Amino acid sequence: MPNPPGPNYRERLWPAAWVFVATALVIPASLLVFLPISTTAGIVCAIVLYAAIVVTLLATAPLVEVDDALFVAGRARLPRTVVAGVTPFSGSDATAQRGTQLDARAWLLIRGWIPGLVKVQLDDPSDPTPYWLVSTRHPEQLTAALKN
């Protein structure tokens, strides 16, 4: 029996390394709060708070996936039959799409630590959402997967 076909594209939007470094600032902050009470409490709270933040960041990293029938971005699912067009963006163009050129009706899956974007135009008269804007580290590959 042949294996079922897998996804055409799959990417987990993991946080960048600098996000973990930046969130490590909770360690000295919690030490400042709890060390006057107890050294042990300060150290334990610092470790527990940082671990909780790291686990939360990892557990909430969304999945972007394209298969033959669906485009999945986080918890949202879009039938590929309603995809009217796909445009990749990077650099200052991606920044403009997230900012000045953003339509308030758009559906967003944006992660600030991921520089690339793909804009997926929709052709669904029953949906007021004009497009999806999805963060990706590989905008060209995601675009190619959605166009195939």
PLM-predicted stretches and their roles:
Residues 1-36:
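N-terminal membrane-targeting/pre-transmembrane regions
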Residues 5, 26, 50, 119-123:
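Hydrophobic, well-ordered secondary-structure segments
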Residues 47-87:
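Conserved beta-hairpin
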Residues 67, 123, 135-137:
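A structural detector for beta-sheet-dominated domains
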Residues 129-148:
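C-terminal/domain-terminus segments
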Residues 22-26, 45-52:
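Lipid-exposed faces of alpha-helical membrane segments in multi-pass integral membrane proteins
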Residues 37-46:
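Short, aromatic-rich membrane-interface segments at the entry and exit
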Residues 74-133:
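Non-transmembrane, membrane-adjacent beta-strand/coil modules in membrane-associated proteins
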